[in-house]
Amino acid sequence: MYTAGSVIIEDGVWIGDKVTILSNVRIGKNAIIGANAVVTKDIPANCVAGGVPAKIIKTITQ
């Protein structure tokens, strides 16, 4: 039997075009995921991430 894990997307997240988000991943508040990224692990709040696999590019300071 196949079961999928949950994906949690918190408030204020921007997700670019054609992004793939794998199961059991949390994307933190106000994070930005660049177009065509593949998110394989959690992305912390207030970060910009992109690439294959997605990596943190920058931390957003407010």
Model-flagged regions — what are they?
Residues 62:
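A glycine/serine/threonine-rich, flexible loop-to-helix segment
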